[in-house]
């Protein structure tokens, strides 16, 4: 039996919802059927089981965005694998050299961005253009 609540809360990409037993209304828990190698949802109160419609039982969405410049660690200036440029002077101290790297923001439809970190040990200002 599908309720209006179920329909409204089981749509959208990556949604993994809570399922309830049709017999006793207790919560169903993921369980492996080892013999048939399928994922089931089983009630711990009665013997009710239902086959899962997806192999995903948990989604962890990370909402942190690299766009938040405060999360860029200034120690990246010591990373020898990062490229360096002298074409983008630091807007804070005017030092000529900066390390840079490319990253995508939270929204996949946006373009990749270049992030810069000033290599001046006394500055380590972070910016993007």
UniProtKB/Swiss-Prot annotation:
Map the zinc fingers (C4-type) to residue ranges: 21-46
- Give the GO biological process terms: maintenance of transcriptional fidelity during transcription elongation by RNA polymerase II; mitotic cell cycle; transcription by RNA polymerase II; transcription initiation at RNA polymerase II promoter; transcription-coupled nucleotide-excision repair
Q: Where in the cell is it found?
A: Nucleus, Nucleolus
**Assigned keywords, A-Z:** DNA-directed RNA polymerase, Metal-binding, Nucleus, Transcription, Zinc, Zinc-finger
Q: Name one GO molecular function term.
A: DNA-directed RNA polymerase activity
For the ligand (Zn(2+) 1), the binding residues are: 21, 24, 43, 46
Q: Name one Pfam family in it.
A: Zn_ribbon_TFIIS
Residues holding Zn(2+) 2: 90, 93, 118, 123
UniProt keyword annotation of Zinc present = yes
Q: Name one GO cellular component term.
A: RNA polymerase II, core complex
SMART domains per UniProt: RPOL9, ZnF_C2C2
* Zn finger (TFIIS-type) start-end: 86-128
Which InterPro entries does the record match to this protein? DNA-dir_RNA_pol-M_15_CS, Rpa12/Rpb9/Rpc10/TFS, Zn_ribbon_RPB9, Zn_ribbon_RPB9_C, Znf_TFIIS
Predominant subcellular localization, coarse grouping: nucleus
Task: Report the sequence similarity comment from the record.
Answer: Belongs to the archaeal RpoM/eukaryotic RPA12/RPB9/RPC11 RNA polymerase family.
Please give the subunit comment from the record. Answer: Component of the RNA polymerase II (Pol II) complex consisting of 12 subunits.
Function of the protein: DNA-dependent RNA polymerase catalyzes the transcription of DNA into RNA using the four ribonucleoside triphosphates as substrates. Component of RNA polymerase II which synthesizes mRNA precursors and many functional non-coding RNAs. Pol II is the central component of the basal RNA polymerase II transcription machinery. It is composed of mobile elements that move relative to each other. RPB9 is part of the upper jaw surrounding the central large cleft and thought to grab the incoming DNA template.
Please give the name of this protein.
DNA-directed RNA polymerase II subunit RPB9
- Protein source organism: Drosophila melanogaster
Name the lineage: Eukaryota, Metazoa, Ecdysozoa, Arthropoda, Hexapoda
**Which gene is this protein's source?**
Polr2I
């Amino acid at each position: 039996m599908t309720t209006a609540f179920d329909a409204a809360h089981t749509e959208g990409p990556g949604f993994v919802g809570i399922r309830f037993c049709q017999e006793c209304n207790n919560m169903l828990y993921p369980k492996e059927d080892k013999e048939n190698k399928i994922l089931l949802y089983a009630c711990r109160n009665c013997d009710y089981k239902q086959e899962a419609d997806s192999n995903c039982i948990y989604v962890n969405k990370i909402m942190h965005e690299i766009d938040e410049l405060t999360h860029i660690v200034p120690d990246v200036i010591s990373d020898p694998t990062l490229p360096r440029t002298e074409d983008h002077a630091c807007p804070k101290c005017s030092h000529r050299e900066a390390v840079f790297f490319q990253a995508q923001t939270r929204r996949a439809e946006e373009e990749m961005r270049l992030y810069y970190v000033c290599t001046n040990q006394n500055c380590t200002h972070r910016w993007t253009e």
